[in-house]
Amino acid sequence: MALWRAYQRALAAHPWKVQVLTAGSLMGVGDMISQQLVERRGLQQHQAGRTLTMVSLGCGFVGPVVGGWYKVLDHLIPGTTKVHALKKMLLDQGGFAPCFLGCFLPLVGILNGMSAQDNWAKLKRDYPDALITNYYLWPAVQLANFYLVPLHYRLAVVQCVAIVWNSYLSWKAHQF
């Protein structure tokens, strides 16, 4: 409980910084899970640079973009009723999620030094599967998130659930 209270105080004092650092940290955890549990690399074969890339993506892309999106979404659809939550989820999953994945996957490719042609081929190959997999997890999570969770905690809640999602995204983004 002390850790949670410290997190709440930090979030109240520095909401943007804490949200971005939370996203980066949990993206890194997701990559470590991907490398160790999914890919079974072992500690000797763990790619620390890849984990750092995912942390950087979390801090520099996921945290700011998703955190900013939640603010925009709350401005576009103010309110916390079930109907408001449903509208937010539909806009999030119908508009934001496809665009986010369409940016995230090529960004990982760029950071991994892929050529534009290889990156485009990888996006065409991986995007449909990633988007379909997104729809298995996120609509229910986001519906609950938009209905039950205050705005300043949404990114943290999503990133906690996203540890599994980040593991999947890291695995998907690093298949060559």
Curated annotation (Swiss-Prot):
Domain of life: Eukaryota
This protein's name: Mitochondrial inner membrane protein Mpv17
Keyword list, A-Z: Deafness, Membrane, Mitochondrion, Mitochondrion inner membrane, Transmembrane, Transmembrane helix
Residues spanning the membrane: 18-38, 53-73, 94-114, 131-151
Membrane topology: Multi-pass membrane protein
Annotated family: Belongs to the peroxisomal membrane protein PXMP2/4 family.
Positions of the record's site feature: Determines ion selectivity: 92
Function noted in UniProt: Non-selective channel that modulates the membrane potential under normal conditions and oxidative stress, and is involved in mitochondrial homeostasis. Involved in mitochondrial deoxynucleoside triphosphates (dNTP) pool homeostasis and mitochondrial DNA (mtDNA) maintenance. May be involved in the regulation of reactive oxygen species metabolism and the control of oxidative phosphorylation.
Organism for this UniProt entry: Mus musculus (Mouse)
Any one Gene Ontology molecular-function term assigned to this protein's record: channel activity
Signal peptide (UniProt feature, chain positions): none
Pfam families: Mpv17_PMP22 (PF04117)
Location of this chain's protein in the cell: Mitochondrion inner membrane
Coiled-coil residue spans: none
